[in-house]
């Protein structure tokens, strides 16, 4: 039985557009994510 293709095809532009800082800052929920990660002391806040 054949396996499907690998689903993770890395692409830096798509990564930034989907999970980036500017996108997170657009919504209230996104800002909450960033502030929670700041509070937790994460080295990396967003992708």
From Swiss-Prot:
Q: List the PROSITE patterns hit by this protein, alphabetically.
A: RIBOSOMAL_L34
Q: Which GO terms describe its biological process?
A: translation
Q: Does the keyword Ribonucleoprotein apply?
A: yes
InterPro entries reported for this sequence: Ribosomal_bL34, Ribosomal_bL34_CS
UniProt keyword annotation of Ribonucleoprotein present: yes
Annotated Gene Ontology MF terms? structural constituent of ribosome
Annotated Pfam families: Ribosomal_L34
**This protein's GO CC annotations:** ribonucleoprotein complex; ribosome
Alphabetically list the UniProt keywords.
Ribonucleoprotein, Ribosomal protein
List where the protein spans the membrane.
Answer: none
What's the family? Belongs to the bacterial ribosomal protein bL34 family.
Write the protein's name: Large ribosomal subunit protein bL34
Its lineage opens with: Bacteria, Bacillati, Actinomycetota, Actinomycetes, Mycobacteriales
């Amino acid at each position: 039985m054949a396996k499907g293709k690998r689903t993770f095809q890395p692409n830096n532009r798509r990564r930034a557009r989907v999970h980036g800082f500017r996108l997170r800052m657009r919504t209230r929920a996104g800002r909450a994510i960033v502030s929670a990660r700041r509070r937790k002391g994460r080295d990396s806040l967003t992708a």
